[in-house]
Amino acid sequence: MTKNPVDHTLIIEPPVRLHGDPTVPKPNIASLDEYKRMYEESINDPSTFWGNMARDMMTWDKQFSTVVQGSIDKADSAWFADGAISPCYNLVDRHAIARPDAVALIYEADEPNQGRYITYRELLASVSQCAGALQSMGVGMGDRVAIYMPMIPETIIAMLAIVRLGAIHSVIFAGFSAESVADRVNDSECKVIITADESHRGGKRIPLKGVVNKALTECPTIKKVLVFQRSAEPTASMVEGRDVWWHDIIPKFPRYCPPAVVNPEHPLFLLYTSGSTGKPKGVVHCTGGYLLGAAATCKYVFDLHPTDRMGCAGDVGWITGHTYIVYGPLMLGAATLVFESTPAYPDYSRYWSVVERHRLTQWYIAPTAIRLLQRAGNEFVKHDRSSLRVLGSVGEPIAPESFMWYYEVVGEKRCAVADTYWQTETGSHIVTSLGPVTPMKPGSATLPFFGIDAVIIDPLTGKIIEGNDVEGVLAIRSPWPSAARTVWRGHDRYIDTYLKPYPGFYFTGDGATRDKDGYIWIRGRVDDVVNISGHRLSTAEIEAALLSHDAVAESAVVGVHDELTGQAVNAFILLKPGYEATVELEKELIMAVRSTIGPFASPRKLIFSDLPKTRSGKIMRRILRKILAGEVDQIGDLSTLADPKVVEHIIHAVHYAHQKKP
């Protein structure tokens, strides 16, 4: 959140669409009144609303008669459960039949001008061949396949090939360590892992196959490894009998493989997210409801049309890439960007050169990137961006000053800005403006999407707070199609995390306010999760990595405000007797986090001190947050602490840590 006062009254009307321009399609939604009418129907009669939308946007092998059953309260909701559908047919085949030469994937390689376009006809052939290769490796209906790949077209081809077989993909972000890869592979008992010899990002070459080789020493379920050669010359260490080069096996298979037909509640993919216990949770998204949520939000939030070119600069290792690089755009038959590089390579104009080169119509990035480019200066925003209609922000609340720069400088005051709020577990947007019609308030996610019965709950009583101009915890009262159904092999964990805190509601974990106009403002996490550059990490996960070092007796991790990344990790460390805080020890502790989770999780500061504990032994992170924020006068009641005097020691330790050079 911004440290400056927020103007809750500033309203920016959505830009007027250029009428009479044949290159600009008619908006998918006409007015704010139409949104209000559709929203009311989606809440009051969800079966009719979502049933009509599913029939309109999806091709069914067997029509459903029941739209939704079950409830949030019982964690048993299901959508279109008596129907049957082929997800890959919906994503690829039907567009390859209707518009075979339309562009499906826009590959922007790390080095500018080295990418390529892939049509829907070509995508169907490549996906079919990859599916055939995986089938020859023993992959079939319901099997799990891991993907640890760079942002290249073959990654999306692999995802779709797995889906084509009715198997379940588990994409692992290519910045995770070998230990993190092994944890995810073992939890889901993957049969095959797909990787590349290396990735290219920001002019650097990063080995991937070596990480996989190390991980697989602990992964007994993996039988085959499919390896794409991203380097000019093969560099990977291959294991005979287990590892297969992509270029050796893929061409051997036919360019058409029949797509699997599945029940709409069949798992489409697993995606691991941070858990409060430190063990990542395999969030399960199911086919019918998830695909509908992805398609509907793309259609109405981004005003995406089949002739559009969607630009999302995310990574498929996270939910943003799943929903708004792969599944949403392809469901609508649009072209979608596969961006391998960084916003600063070779310079800070890279994003805007991509927009100009490919004539992108939507642009979707995180506030971290927006802040980075805002700092770099307006001189880099020099490319033709006239093709853009809707800008989007994702991952964390966007500060009003960054919103205004995005709107005024990047969008030239003619593009709507959608500040989208959602989570891995929600599958698609839950609070957001609809690009063509919603008046914008810088800093606010605005209004609930269709079917999202959003409520503000009093955290003390657990009761709904009615009316506007209220603050509390954000929760959802009714099922929606794209919601995760469970945690892989851990339904009790799903219930404990999302449903038990406030029975009868889905708990988002975020605090929120609803202003006098009914607009929702996200205030940040109320549970033990940090948000770094839009990526959520459990504090327990980082603490466990620190505790793996022999010197650490206890640790407590908190997130602190950071102008660039949103939050940064600060770690409080209590050392075992006989150990001293040295520069060398600090390096070892940071390396422990890097090697266990990944470099992006590294603590910004290590603070060596005792910890504020209650008499029952619970660490009071609230006190640590207040001290780090310089709000010592707002710490409040210390009577529950076992030793209130420890607070003074922590204040001195924080002061000392701040004096040290970073």
Swiss-Prot record:
CoA binds at R201, G202, G203, K204, T320, S533, R594. This is Probable acetyl-coenzyme A synthetase. It catalyses: acetate + ATP + CoA = acetyl-CoA + AMP + diphosphate. One of its GO terms (molecular function) is ATP binding. Signal peptide: none annotated. PANTHER family: ACETYL-COENZYME A SYNTHETASE, ACETYL-COENZYME A SYNTHETASE 1. InterPro entries: Ac_CoA_lig (IPR011904), ACAS_N (IPR032387), AMP-bd_C (IPR025110), AMP-bd_C_sf (IPR045851), AMP-binding_CS (IPR020845), AMP-dep_synth/lig_dom (IPR000873), ANL_N_sf (IPR042099). Disulfide bonds: none annotated. GO terms for cellular component: cytoplasm; cytosol; mitochondrion; nucleus. Belongs to the ATP-dependent AMP-binding enzyme family. Keywords: ATP-binding, Ligase, Nucleotide-binding, Phosphoprotein. It comes from the Eukaryota. It comes from Schizosaccharomyces pombe (strain 972 / ATCC 24843) (Fission yeast). PROSITE patterns: AMP_BINDING (PS00455). GO terms for biological process: acetyl-CoA biosynthetic process; acetyl-CoA biosynthetic process from acetate. ATP binds at G395, E396, P397, D419, T420, Y421, W422, Q423, T424, D510, R525, R536.
